[in-house]
């Protein structure tokens, strides 16, 4: 018996109002500097999340990590100071694989998804490894997101910048 699976990713288009505004490109995404998140067309506009054209995932973690860079850069910009924040394209996400297991990936502009411990040098989770612990981490993340991250509470040992992989 011959089996095949075709996996396709639909074209990710930005919102129609972005096109109507004149800010967007042919994909209705706003072109920005990928490090500062500042519009390439209007220096008073910064764009975060799904609306910008950075070469990164459109996952919520990207927007979350963009916030810190944006806040610092925006405050420096309105104070007429040079912007010092630089977004590194950091993204991470859990991928459910079924049967109570999941994988976890972590990457940025420089480093593709890689194996290794997460979030500390000893784990307890493993990147690019299917496990029950990663699945439980995904389930726990909902609570952490709503009760810790949104309140901007710091998590010990967790950096918003992607750390160099141990094997790089």
Explain the meaning of each model-derived region.
Residues 4-68, 75-76:
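FAD-site-proximal beta/loop scaffold in flavoenzymes
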Residues 8-14, 78-79, 88-94, 107-125:
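Short, surface-exposed, charge-dense and proline/glycine-enriched linear segments
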Residues 22-30, 45-54, 85-94, 132-141, ...:
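Noncatalytic linker/hinge segments flanking ATPase motor cores
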Residues 28-46, 97-118:
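FAD-binding beta-loop-beta segment adjacent to the flavin cofactor pocket
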Residues 36-42, 61, 76-81, 124-129, ...:
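Short C-terminal domain-edge/linker segments immediately following a structured domain
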Residues 51-91, 95-97, 105-106:
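A conserved FAD-binding loop/helix module that cradles the flavin
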Residues 104-168:
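C-terminal auxiliary extensions adjacent to catalytic cores
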